[in-house]
């Protein structure tokens, strides 16, 4: 059986809300058709990294490890799946959040595999999902306040809020599980590499 979020009533209610409250649910497609431009040189990558990760890197004062990390970050930001996903977002807010979380998550990990990068893309997609779900909940709460006395509408809005709360919790759980998997696997790999290096020495 279909859940409420897939039901005809839910779809009809969404259409009703879109017609009755256009200013509340409207989202401007302010990035539609614009292609994301990844950084290709160190200075541009450093500027973005400093902005989103609260760093103060200076290209003239980079140590070898930091330079290696930032050079690798440039390749991460040119990865095909990252580009595909970021270009699928039609609002600048979603693109900026996705890019920021991706940079924060990956910039200091120059040894990530392709599979791990794809998982970080998934994590960052869920960060965007969380933001969108939270915005939907806020809008539904506003409409709930405006619909006082309209029993049928308030009942449906209550069901929609419950659905959004469940989506939010599922999203949080997915992020936690993926990060635990990523951090655990990388920690093992780094430990094994250190062990191999020690045995060579």
Residue ranges: model-predicted function:
Residues 1-201:
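Intrinsically disordered, low-complexity, charged/polar segments
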